[in-house]
Protein backbone atom coordinates (compact mmCIF):
# COMPACT_ATOMS: atom_id res chain seq x y z
CA UNK A 1 0.00 0.00 0.00
CA UNK A 2 1.01 3.59 -0.37
CA UNK A 3 1.65 5.83 2.59
CA UNK A 4 0.66 5.07 6.16
CA UNK A 5 -3.11 4.95 5.78
CA UNK A 6 -3.75 1.43 4.60
CA UNK A 7 -6.92 1.10 2.58
CA UNK A 8 -6.85 4.57 1.07
CA UNK A 9 -5.37 3.49 -2.27
CA UNK A 10 -7.50 4.01 -5.31
CA UNK A 11 -8.94 1.00 -7.10
CA UNK A 12 -8.78 1.73 -10.82
CA UNK A 13 -10.77 -1.34 -11.86
CA UNK A 14 -12.86 -4.08 -10.23
CA UNK A 15 -10.93 -7.14 -9.16
CA UNK A 16 -7.44 -5.77 -8.65
CA UNK A 17 -6.36 -5.78 -5.04
CA UNK A 18 -2.75 -6.82 -4.84
CA UNK A 19 -2.11 -5.85 -1.22
CA UNK A 20 -0.44 -8.46 0.92
CA UNK A 21 1.22 -8.15 4.24
CA UNK A 22 4.95 -8.34 4.74
CA UNK A 23 4.48 -11.73 6.41
CA UNK A 24 2.67 -13.11 3.37
CA UNK A 25 5.39 -11.68 1.14
CA UNK A 26 8.16 -13.27 3.25
CA UNK A 27 6.44 -16.67 3.14
CA UNK A 28 5.92 -16.34 -0.61
CA UNK A 29 9.59 -15.47 -1.15
CA UNK A 30 10.73 -18.42 0.96
CA UNK A 31 8.44 -20.81 -0.92
CA UNK A 32 9.53 -19.45 -4.30
CA UNK A 33 13.19 -20.00 -3.42
CA UNK A 34 12.39 -23.69 -2.82
CA UNK A 35 10.82 -24.28 -6.25
CA UNK A 36 14.05 -25.46 -7.99
CA UNK A 37 14.69 -27.94 -5.15
CA UNK A 38 11.10 -29.22 -5.34
CA UNK A 39 11.29 -29.65 -9.12
CA UNK A 40 14.59 -31.54 -8.80
CA UNK A 41 13.10 -33.91 -6.21
CA UNK A 42 9.88 -34.41 -8.17
CA UNK A 43 11.80 -35.24 -11.35
CA UNK A 44 14.00 -37.74 -9.52
CA UNK A 45 10.98 -39.45 -7.95
CA UNK A 46 9.17 -39.53 -11.29
CA UNK A 47 12.19 -41.15 -12.99
CA UNK A 48 12.47 -43.66 -10.16
CA UNK A 49 8.81 -44.63 -10.57
CA UNK A 50 9.18 -44.92 -14.35
CA UNK A 51 12.16 -47.24 -13.88
CA UNK A 52 10.30 -49.37 -11.33
CA UNK A 53 7.16 -49.65 -13.48
CA UNK A 54 8.53 -49.73 -17.03
CA UNK A 55 9.10 -53.49 -17.12
CA UNK A 56 5.38 -54.22 -16.72
CA UNK A 57 3.61 -54.92 -20.00
CA UNK A 58 0.53 -52.84 -19.09
CA UNK A 59 2.25 -49.52 -18.52
CA UNK A 60 3.45 -47.04 -21.09
CA UNK A 61 4.45 -43.43 -20.57
CA UNK A 62 3.87 -40.24 -22.52
CA UNK A 63 6.78 -38.88 -24.52
CA UNK A 64 7.23 -35.29 -23.45
CA UNK A 65 8.01 -32.62 -26.01
CA UNK A 66 10.16 -30.73 -23.49
CA UNK A 67 11.48 -33.02 -20.77
CA UNK A 68 13.63 -30.18 -19.40
CA UNK A 69 10.46 -28.18 -18.83
CA UNK A 70 8.74 -31.01 -16.95
CA UNK A 71 8.15 -30.10 -13.31
CA UNK A 72 7.73 -33.77 -12.40
CA UNK A 73 4.44 -32.98 -10.68
CA UNK A 74 2.55 -35.90 -12.24
CA UNK A 75 3.31 -39.38 -13.47
CA UNK A 76 0.92 -40.34 -16.26
CA UNK A 77 0.43 -44.05 -16.82
CA UNK A 78 -1.16 -45.29 -20.01
CA UNK A 79 -2.77 -48.70 -19.88
CA UNK A 80 -3.57 -50.75 -23.00
CA UNK A 81 -7.24 -49.72 -23.25
CA UNK A 82 -10.14 -48.16 -21.35
CA UNK A 83 -11.45 -51.44 -19.95
CA UNK A 84 -8.04 -52.40 -18.57
CA UNK A 85 -7.65 -48.92 -17.06
CA UNK A 86 -11.07 -49.18 -15.36
CA UNK A 87 -10.19 -52.56 -13.83
CA UNK A 88 -6.80 -51.18 -12.74
CA UNK A 89 -8.47 -48.18 -11.08
CA UNK A 90 -10.94 -50.51 -9.33
CA UNK A 91 -8.00 -52.50 -7.95
CA UNK A 92 -6.31 -49.30 -6.75
CA UNK A 93 -9.48 -48.25 -4.96
CA UNK A 94 -9.87 -51.71 -3.40
CA UNK A 95 -6.28 -51.46 -2.08
CA UNK A 96 -6.97 -47.99 -0.67
CA UNK A 97 -4.35 -46.35 -2.88
CA UNK A 98 -5.01 -42.65 -3.21
CA UNK A 99 -3.37 -39.73 -4.95
CA UNK A 100 -4.37 -40.73 -8.46
CA UNK A 101 -6.79 -39.29 -11.00
CA UNK A 102 -8.74 -41.26 -13.56
CA UNK A 103 -9.77 -38.38 -15.78
CA UNK A 104 -12.18 -40.50 -17.84
CA UNK A 105 -14.68 -40.58 -14.96
CA UNK A 106 -13.60 -37.35 -13.26
CA UNK A 107 -16.55 -35.02 -12.70
CA UNK A 108 -14.64 -31.80 -13.46
CA UNK A 109 -11.86 -32.47 -15.91
CA UNK A 110 -13.33 -34.46 -18.79
CA UNK A 111 -16.32 -34.06 -21.08
CA UNK A 112 -17.92 -37.43 -20.22
CA UNK A 113 -19.44 -35.86 -17.10
CA UNK A 114 -20.01 -32.34 -18.40
CA UNK A 115 -23.80 -32.47 -18.63
CA UNK A 116 -23.97 -28.83 -17.58
CA UNK A 117 -21.98 -27.94 -20.71
CA UNK A 118 -23.50 -30.40 -23.17
CA UNK A 119 -26.98 -29.29 -22.11
CA UNK A 120 -25.90 -25.62 -21.75
CA UNK A 121 -27.28 -25.25 -18.22
CA UNK A 122 -26.49 -21.82 -16.80
CA UNK A 123 -27.92 -19.23 -14.44
CA UNK A 124 -28.31 -16.74 -17.26
CA UNK A 125 -28.58 -16.71 -21.03
CA UNK A 126 -25.47 -17.62 -23.00
CA UNK A 127 -24.40 -15.73 -26.13
CA UNK A 128 -24.90 -18.89 -28.21
CA UNK A 129 -28.54 -18.95 -27.13
CA UNK A 130 -28.93 -15.58 -28.84
CA UNK A 131 -26.47 -15.99 -31.72
CA UNK A 132 -26.86 -19.71 -32.29
CA UNK A 133 -24.68 -22.66 -31.33
CA UNK A 134 -21.86 -23.58 -33.73
CA UNK A 135 -22.59 -27.26 -33.08
CA UNK A 136 -24.92 -29.59 -31.24
CA UNK A 137 -23.21 -30.05 -27.88
CA UNK A 138 -25.68 -32.74 -26.73
CA UNK A 139 -24.43 -35.18 -29.34
CA UNK A 140 -20.78 -34.10 -29.35
CA UNK A 141 -18.53 -37.13 -29.77
CA UNK A 142 -14.76 -37.16 -29.20
CA UNK A 143 -13.80 -40.80 -29.82
CA UNK A 144 -10.04 -40.25 -30.25
CA UNK A 145 -9.84 -38.15 -27.10
CA UNK A 146 -11.96 -40.63 -25.16
CA UNK A 147 -9.75 -43.51 -26.29
CA UNK A 148 -6.65 -41.71 -25.00
CA UNK A 149 -8.10 -40.35 -21.75
CA UNK A 150 -9.78 -43.70 -21.07
CA UNK A 151 -6.32 -45.30 -20.88
CA UNK A 152 -4.77 -42.58 -18.68
CA UNK A 153 -4.24 -42.78 -14.92
CA UNK A 154 -2.31 -39.87 -13.37
CA UNK A 155 -0.50 -39.79 -10.03
CA UNK A 156 0.48 -36.63 -8.21
CA UNK A 157 4.12 -36.72 -7.11
CA UNK A 158 5.13 -35.31 -3.74
CA UNK A 159 8.67 -34.12 -3.21
CA UNK A 160 8.42 -35.29 0.41
CA UNK A 161 8.17 -39.00 -0.46
CA UNK A 162 10.88 -41.17 0.98
CA UNK A 163 12.58 -43.87 -1.07
CA UNK A 164 10.57 -46.47 0.87
CA UNK A 165 7.30 -44.68 0.02
CA UNK A 166 8.20 -44.56 -3.67
CA UNK A 167 8.97 -48.29 -3.66
CA UNK A 168 5.75 -49.03 -1.77
CA UNK A 169 3.70 -47.08 -4.31
CA UNK A 170 5.41 -48.88 -7.20
CA UNK A 171 4.78 -52.25 -5.54
CA UNK A 172 1.12 -51.37 -5.02
CA UNK A 173 0.73 -50.30 -8.66
CA UNK A 174 2.42 -53.47 -9.88
CA UNK A 175 0.23 -55.57 -7.57
CA UNK A 176 -2.90 -53.95 -8.99
CA UNK A 177 -1.64 -54.46 -12.56
CA UNK A 178 -0.80 -58.11 -11.90
CA UNK A 179 -4.38 -58.75 -10.74
CA UNK A 180 -5.74 -57.85 -14.17
Over which residues does each language-model region extend?
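Active-site region of PLP-dependent enzymes
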Residues: 1-74
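Conserved PLP cofactor-binding pocket of PLP-dependent enzymes
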Residues: 3-6, 48-52, 89-152
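Extracellular structured ligand-interaction cores
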Residues: 15, 72-74, 94-96, 152-154
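Short, amphipathic alpha-helical "lid/cap" segments that border enzyme active or binding sites
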Residues: 29, 163-170, 174
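Short hydrophobic/aromatic beta-strand micro-patches
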Residues: 76-80
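Short amphipathic alpha-helices in soluble, non-transmembrane regions
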Residues: 86-95, 169-173
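Proline-centric
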Residues: 154-164
Amino acid sequence: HLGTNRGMETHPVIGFNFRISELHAAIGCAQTRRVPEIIKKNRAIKQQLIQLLSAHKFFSFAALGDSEGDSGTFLNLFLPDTETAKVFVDHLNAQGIGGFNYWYTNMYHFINQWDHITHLRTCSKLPIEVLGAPQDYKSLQLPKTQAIIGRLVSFGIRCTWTDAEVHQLAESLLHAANRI
